[in-house]
């Protein structure tokens, strides 16, 4: 198993390796990924073969807040911090459902959460958690191809 992924001790951790990085991977996600709209978040997702830098990490995630919608850096940073925390607390929905076999490492899901509301009133952590929980459940039930052992993701 991926260290810390489904263990009892660090179930809710969000290690650095799970944060999506790299211009080519991110641009591929934005150009070819599917989209799922929520109330104030947009989720862009893609399932593919693992990248060389992180072959054993089943889910990689990215959080962005546009400068045009939220001009103040302090507000953008607060929103990204809230999104990261909400995802960290709700990611078990996704990781348990994927039933990732680290020995195979045959697929990787990339997610990008984009904040798309104005910064007039920043939502609370509970609202972010509810939104991300709803989006992850919707992603698993309708959008993401089956990823159980034996199935393939193209």
Swiss-Prot record:
Keyword annotations for this protein, in alphabetical order, are: Endonuclease, Hydrolase, Nuclease, RNA-binding, tRNA processing
Q: Name one GO molecular function term.
A: tRNA binding
E.C. numbers: 3.1.26.5
Record-linked InterPro entries: Ribosomal_Su5_D2-typ_SF (IPR020568), Ribsml_uS5_D2-typ_fold_subgr (IPR014721), RNase_P (IPR000100), RNase_P_CS (IPR020539)
Q: What chemistry does it catalyse, as a reaction equation?
A: Endonucleolytic cleavage of RNA, removing 5'-extranucleotides from tRNA precursor
The enzyme's main class, written as a single word, is hydrolase
A single Gene Ontology biological process assigned to it is: tRNA 5'-leader removal
Q: How does it assemble?
A: Consists of a catalytic RNA component (M1 or rnpB) and a protein subunit.
Please give the function described in this protein's UniProt entry: RNaseP catalyzes the removal of the 5'-leader sequence from pre-tRNA to produce the mature 5'-terminus. It can also cleave other RNA substrates such as 4.5S RNA. The protein component plays an auxiliary but essential role in vivo by binding to the 5'-leader sequence and broadening the substrate specificity of the ribozyme.
State the similarity comment. Belongs to the RnpA family.
What protein is this chain from?
Answer: Ribonuclease P protein component
Gene this chain is encoded by = rnpA
